[in-house]
Amino acid sequence: YPHQGGEVEHFCEALLELMPEQNFLLVAFQVEDWNRDFSPWEAPAAFGTEAFDGQGARTLKWLLEEGVPYIDRTYHVKEQEHWLAGYSLAGLFALWSAYECDIFSGIACCSGSLWFKNWDIYMREHTLKRKCSVYLSLGGKEEKTKNAVMATVGDRTREQEKLLLEDSFAERVVLEWNPGGHFADSGKRLAKGIKWLMEKRYELKNYEK
């Protein structure tokens, strides 16, 4: 789970409140530059002057070659399912990762930055790399912005859900709408995504039996 600042504690509290009896390992990692390290490719600034440097591939390479193997060795979870969750640009990164590698069987993209330049083209031209459950969420007010770029997030997210529902590797897909704007209850929104993935995991396990 890629995080920013002090949101981990809030996320953990919300997760334990929603799933008090579940057994899971939550690992958070932080990057030096959010716009640089989570953007899948270069793009102009959506607001302000800070552009996106497109170093997401480097972050994913570190995650696959160092981060996940370290977690597997340290906590002996190599045989367990691995999920990736993120909020905002980190949510986009998590979703993009599912199109780029076959490690993650669950993705939670919460208030994802699907307004990112050319993401609409990318998602139409790619399919998931493995069987995967995908949770999407968005705040009801997020698309109601004067920023023309960010105002596309609603339609982009709806189209993303539609494409995933048509993807043969997508086992379960949902788009959940939350009250409020982009910065409302980020920890709780992430926790809801993990809870949904957990519920779908048990549904699939029971179905396979």
Model-flagged regions — what are they?
Residues 91-101:
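Short glycine-enriched nucleophile-adjacent loop
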Residues 15-16, 97-98, 161:
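A conserved amphipathic alpha-helix that caps or lines the catalytic cleft of carbohydrate-
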Residues 59, 87-91:
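Active-site loop->helix "elbow" adjoining a glycine-rich segment at hydrolase catalytic centers
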